[in-house]
């Protein structure tokens, strides 16, 4: 293609004034006219965008790399244009093009960390916003059961915090490198519980156990991260080695935090957990946040379910992680109906690190490695993928990589077996200079990223197949990684995280779990100063913040939002707060499309009621309230024995008497799970809603019936005369004839929504799951 005449003139003028400063590259966003005629002359939009870059680069400098290696993004929806690495001279050339609308430096504008609070809209709408209405969570105390805390982190600074609530009964327990002065008005309490762990892990039996603080001080970083997410103070200029720069805040920055260290290097023991819950109740916390759990177990064997029943009775809201065993069906844990079970979703913040193959093809990846500021981080090198044998070389296990083959090369490492950052450590030890983490079929397109020890990026399964095909078909395959910094708002979000545990619950199938999802992927939050950002022993870098992913990260988001609602409505029960969160949750992403689970719309067993929306939850209109005694009746309907119920509720009850007094009982849960046993064609449930909005409100029902099911609601209108009034309705689920007599179990989903007749935007929605059983 011949150079355009106007480009040649500008190139000549700029060449005469070129300097080393002008030749320094930075990222620019080039916006093009959307209806350009020249676009039609190119095979693809990518080629059209690339043509501008090729013309700009021509003659300005001696270019050793292909212009395509500079192209970071090709846009077509938000704007027509592209983002690229350009010198000042090249950017000036593009500004003179009649087809270019604007050329803008890639400034960081209002990029927030943890950005999730902005993604959730907590900082918006002035005096009517969630933070304003809830006074930032002031007066509430959030108990965090985790690995401890790093009290010197700026996220726990107490500047501007109010006095410690008078009701607080806790202490700041002294221990190794932790004194009573480590606490303040933000971090008001800290305790540690090690006895169960200690007796199970004696030094004689575990001589290689890592050294850790015998105190509430965090040795691993997990607890510091979750505690700052739930209620960390504002920290300006927060970033991870330059990425994600902005102001860090927890969900409830005005709330007080109490830390209970129950997890150690070898795990979290039930005895220690139960002891912490026991003390937290005495300490008078308002919210308990538990980013821990295991596999599904019956409620009567579940220490967390048992311990938190009492907490619920005392008015404490309990929030638990759903678990990271997704996308396996029925992997969800922490399913007691008196706790909120939280799955994980994504944010619309990306950290692009694109792989450019020597043949010019680009494979999208992500990384928090600070490639922009490190010399040779993006140089082109040979790529190798080591397979075969029984050493686990494809997974890049330590000691599995042959040094003579790896030295000086970029290594492809499959996900699985060991940690993502550990793979990079293994590559670096073997002499490799860069790494491409390749998702397998299990991981699909999951994009959990890390602050790697060497230049590295993570690519999805689709891209990994293309990469391996290129390597296998090329004599000397080469590639480079192009690090693109932080990008906001250019991707669909939220989506369900691949690792987020799925329902239905094996232990408790009559309750739909998880309850909801919240941000849990690539969350930036506080980090201890005794660890590098990867948490690996040989990582000598030190940061105040790092990135983590998991339902451990989504759990504290909801814990903090729960504290906000409790601060706004201190007399609400835990069930009412949970109802407000669930019935206002989002089913659609920021583009107005159904939230995705992989390549399909997310179902109720992936997202429960949907993605948490605190802006709506602060004004839910109606709530489904549940009294502690209702849970006991519910357990009776499950057929639990007297001893089972006693173990869970600490109440010695007669289910025969309870069921006689409550015929046809159904728990007043905000979601609806219906199970048709073999031979049954009709099921009926009852629900009660309480008006917490305006007096003289009228709500009309709207039903999206599950496929093959007829749904009848009576009454169809609820007329509330005053606030706090409670009204009941019944719902019949009738199996249509075509679905009767089936030989296999089947599933359908729908939703039931009460719409405020005076405010159509106020919708109180309950997800519906219907299961047809054959035995």
UniProtKB/Swiss-Prot annotation:
GO terms for biological process: proteolysis; regulation of cell population proliferation; stomatal complex morphogenesis. It is a peripheral membrane protein. Its EC number is 3.4.21.-. It is an enzyme of class 3 (hydrolase). InterPro entries: PA_domain, Peptidase_S8/S53_dom, Peptidase_S8/S53_dom_sf, Peptidase_S8_Ser-AS, Peptidase_S8_subtilisin-rel, Peptidases_S8_3, S8pro/Inhibitor_I9, S8pro/Inhibitor_I9_sf. One of its GO terms (molecular function) is serine-type endopeptidase activity. It is found in: Secreted, Extracellular space, Apoplast; Cell membrane. This is Subtilisin-like protease SBT1.2.
């Amino acid at each position: 293609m011949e150079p355009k005449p106007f480009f040649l003139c500008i190139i000549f003028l700029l060449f005469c004034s070129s300097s080393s400063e002008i030749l320094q590259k930075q990222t620019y966003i080039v916006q093009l006219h959307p209806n350009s005629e020249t676009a039609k002359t190119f095979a693809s939009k990518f080629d059209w965008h690339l043509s501008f870059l090729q013309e700009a680069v021509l003659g300005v400098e001696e270019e050793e790399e292909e212009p395509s290696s500079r192209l970071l993004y090709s846009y077509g929806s938000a704007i027509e244009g592209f983002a690229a690495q350009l010198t000042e001279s090249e950017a000036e050339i593009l500004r003179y093009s009649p087809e270019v609308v604007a050329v803008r430096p890639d400034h960081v504008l209002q990029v927030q960390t943890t950005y999730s609070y902005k993604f959730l809209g907590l900082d918006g709408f002035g005096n009517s916003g969630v933070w304003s209405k809830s006074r930032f969570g002031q007066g509430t105390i959030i108990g965090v059961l985790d690995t401890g805390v790093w009290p010197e982190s700026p996220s726990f600074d107490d500047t501007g915090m109010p006095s410690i609530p008078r009701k607080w009964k806790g202490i700041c327990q002294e221990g190794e490198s932790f004194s009573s002065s480590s606490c303040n008005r933000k971090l008001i309490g800290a305790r540690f519980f090690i006895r169960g762990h200690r007796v199970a892990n004696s030094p004689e039996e575990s001589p290689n156990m890592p050294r850790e603080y015998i105190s509430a001080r965090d040795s691993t970083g997990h607890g510091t991260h979750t505690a700052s997410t739930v209620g960390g103070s504002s920290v300006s200029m927060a970033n991870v080695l330059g990425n994600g720069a902005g102001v860090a805040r927890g969900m409830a920055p005005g709330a007080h935090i109490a830390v209970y260290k129950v997890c150690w290097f070898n795990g979290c023991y039930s005895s220690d957990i139960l002891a912490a819950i026991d003390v937290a109740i005495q300490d008078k916390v308002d919210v308990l946040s538990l980013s821990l759990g295991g596999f599904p177990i019956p409620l009567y064997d579940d220490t967390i379910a048992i311990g938190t029943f009492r907490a619920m009775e005392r008015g404490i809201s309990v929030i638990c992680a759903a678990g990271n065993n997704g996308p396996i069906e029925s992997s969800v844990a922490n399913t007691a109906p008196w706790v909120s079970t939280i799955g994980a979703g994504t944010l619309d913040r990306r950290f692009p690190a694109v792989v450019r193959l020597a043949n010019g093809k680009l494979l999208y990846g992500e990384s928090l490695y600070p490639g922009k500021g490190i010399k040779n981080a993006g140089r082109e090198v040979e790529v190798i993928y080591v397979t075969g044998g029984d050493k686990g070389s494809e997974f890049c296990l330590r000691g599995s990589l042959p040094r003579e083959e790896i030295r000086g090369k970029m290594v492809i490492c499959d996900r699985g077996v060991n940690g993502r950052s550990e793979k990079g450590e293994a590559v670096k030890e073997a002499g490799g200079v860069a790494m491409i983490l390749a998702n397998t079929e299990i991981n699909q397109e999951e994009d959990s990223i890390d602050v790697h020890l060497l230049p590295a990026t993570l690519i999805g399964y689709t891209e990994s197949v293309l990469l391996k095909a290129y390597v296998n078909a090329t004599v000397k395959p080469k590639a480079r990684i192009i690090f693109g910094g932080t990008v906001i708002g250019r991707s669909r979000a939220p989506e369900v995280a691949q690792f987020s545990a799925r329902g239905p619950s094996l232990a408790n199938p009559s309750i739909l779990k998880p309850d909801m999802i919240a941000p849990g992927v690539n969350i930036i939050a506080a980090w201890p100063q005794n660890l590098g950002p990867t948490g690996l022993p040989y990582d000598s870098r030190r940061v105040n913040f790092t990135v983590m992913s998991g339902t451990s990260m989504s759990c504290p988001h909801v814990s903090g939002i729960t504290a906000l609602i409790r601060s706004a409505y201190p007399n609400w029960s835990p069930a009412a707060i949970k109802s407000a969160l669930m019935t206002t949750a989002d089913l659609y992403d920021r583009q107005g499309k159904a939230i995705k689970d992989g390549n399909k719309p997310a179902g109720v067993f992936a997202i429960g009621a949907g993605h948490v929306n605190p802006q709506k939850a602060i004004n839910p209109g109606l709530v489904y309230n549940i009294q502690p005694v209702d849970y006991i009746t519910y357990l009776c309907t499950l057929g639990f024995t007297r001893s089972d119920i006693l173990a869970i509720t600490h109440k010695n009850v007669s289910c025969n008497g309870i069921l006689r007094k409550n015929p046809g009982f159904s728990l007043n849960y905000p979601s609806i799970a219906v199970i048709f046993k073999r031979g049954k064609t009709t099921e009926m449930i009852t629900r009660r809603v309480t008006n917490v909005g305006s007096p003289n409100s009228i709500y009309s029902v709207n039903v999206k019936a599950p496929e093959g099911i007829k749904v009848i609601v009576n009454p169809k209108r609820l007329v509330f005369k005053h606030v706090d009034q409670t009204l009941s309705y019944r719902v019949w689920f009738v199996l249509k004839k075509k679905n009767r007599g089936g030989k296999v179990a089947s599933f359908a989903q729908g939703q039931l929504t009460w719409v405020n007749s005076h405010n159509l935007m106020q919708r109180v929605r309950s997800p519906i799951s219907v299961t047809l059983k054959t035995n």
